Amino acid sequence: MPIITLQYEDLESLTKADKDTIIDRVPMIGADIERIEKEAIDIEFFPDRPDLYSVEGVARAMRGFMNIETGLCQYEVTPSGVHIELDEKIKEVRPVLGCAIVKGINFTSSSIKSLMDLQEDLHWGLGRNRKKVSIGVHDMTNIEPPFKYQAVSPDFEFVPLDFTEPMTMDEVLEKHPKGVRFANILEGMEKYPLITDSEGKVLSFPPIINGTLTRVEESTTDLFIDVTGLGDAVYTALSIVVSALAERGGKIESVKVVYPDGTEKVTPDMTPRTLNVPRSDIDSLIGIKLTDDEIINELKRMRFDASVLEDGDMFEISVPTYRADILHNFDIVEDIAIGYGFDKIKSEFPKSATIGCAHPISVTRGVMREIMVSLGYSEVMPFTLTSQKVHFEWMNREETDDVTFVLHPISEDQTMVRTTILPNLIEIFSLNQHHELPQRLFEVGEVVVNSKNRLHLAAASIHAQANFTEIREVLDAVMRERDIEYEVVVSEDPAFIEGRRADILVNGEKVGMMGELYPEVIINFGLGQPIVGFEIDLTE
């Protein structure tokens, strides 16, 4: 989780409260104080609150929580008259772009550091180390709009930030510290993204490094901000950055993004979205009945706007664009509880006393872990959310109708709940190619089939001599330890080599499968060694 260093002078100025009061109250909004020093305080926030990754965001939240300034923050956005054109080929490289101009900023060394820290924390929290989102911040003094976002040849030359001589883009990836660190994002691409001005001067080589021409100094007053990436998180990151700058007196101006087909998108869009939350959700989740005025007051303290709809049973809530964590009504209810104060919600003793014991599924899970570890396998715990590409396309399988999909996915990597575990294990192999072979992994975890949770055990092994006999011996050991009689029956599955795949039957019913992965599947995951694996259902 990100640890934010907040300078007291900055914090007191932006919050309009003294440091002792802030230190006393800041844990109540979901922060852990890591360190208190003479000039600054280090605070750790949960990753789901990227709007609190800066002193400006913390100050905004604290002003509301302490009743200094409540309700929705209104950030005025005026048209700049500036536009940026997208090249046709950029959609194959890094297709999503959001831009803004912020003018009239009075920078100090500490405010520049705060902005750069926010930028890097967003790269981590929202951007998956710049893969999904990367942010460029530019001094506008030496550049002339309109701008262009294009895909160019890797031999294009420019002077990157912190260097004095021109380098090709390939050289940047090989020699510049940022290039070396993030080169994997552009691996395999024939063209690289580039942002230039009307005179061809380079602003940015996203997601790697800015050009040296637009370095931000204390004398900088006007900024051009570009955010590139792969999805809607781009626009959230842009909102967080420009709202932080507006907290320091910056004036936000919009930029028109012009796509190759002539369509246009004006960014940033700071228009709040609306959620309707039933009173029944609030009452049942918090456990106490608050009045309408109390609910609205707590929402305003948490920097929302709210009103009661005519039927009296529904609250209409305006959510600011920088709140990336508000995905469901439950998130709103949580903020109401935070605003009200968990210390005010009294706990109750249970009406009856019982003696607990481990659930049979938990016992099975523990036993299977012990068995697999004793067989030389390492346990992993990947996400249960995955994508159709990994789960079906890369496994050479047709999409089935027993899948549970995510209604509004925020990432193309997490669009469905897995129905099997093996694709996750193979994906981990692809991420661990820098480790020596053999690698043997297992997971005892949940899958969802036909909207029902099932507990599965999956194991996989990768090395040059991996074969059906090896994985059969592992399965034999597992079943022997559990005193389960089973049989295997040859079956077909496009993910496995024909004749080297079998169903696992217990009492005549299929409980799993095993086999050698088909070479094309192995290649789909970017691997080059044989893989064998099995997966069984432990639910019954």
Swiss-Prot record:
InterPro entries: aa-tRNA-synth_II/BPL/LPL (IPR045864), B3/B4_tRNA-bd (IPR005146), DNA-bd_dom_put_sf (IPR009061), Phe-tRNA-ligase_IIc_bsu (IPR045060), Phe-tRNA-synth_IIc_bsu_arc_euk (IPR004531), Phe-tRNA_synthase-like_B3/B4 (IPR020825), Phe_tRNA_ligase_beta2_arc (IPR022918), PheRS_beta_core (IPR041616)
EC numbers on record: 6.1.1.20
SUPFAM superfamilies: Class II aaRS and biotin synthetases, Putative DNA-binding domain
Substrates-to-products reaction catalysed: tRNA(Phe) + L-phenylalanine + ATP = L-phenylalanyl-tRNA(Phe) + AMP + diphosphate + H(+)
Annotated B5 domain residues: 270-347
Reported cofactor(s): Mg(2+)
Alphabetized UniProt keyword annotations: Aminoacyl-tRNA synthetase, ATP-binding, Cytoplasm, Ligase, Magnesium, Metal-binding, Nucleotide-binding, Protein biosynthesis
This protein's GO CC annotations: phenylalanine-tRNA ligase complex
UniProt feature coiled coil, ranges: none
CDD domains hit by this protein: PheRS_beta_core
Pfam families reported for this sequence: B3_4, B5, tRNA_synthFbeta
Residues reported to bind Mg(2+): D325, D331, E334, D335
GO molecular function, one term: ATP binding
Places the protein is found: Cytoplasm
Gene3D superfamilies: 3.30.56.10, Bira Bifunctional Protein, Domain 2 (3.30.930.10), Phenylalanyl-trna Synthetase, Chain B, domain 3 (3.50.40.10)
Family: Belongs to the phenylalanyl-tRNA synthetase beta subunit family. Type 2 subfamily.
Name assigned to this protein: Phenylalanine--tRNA ligase beta subunit
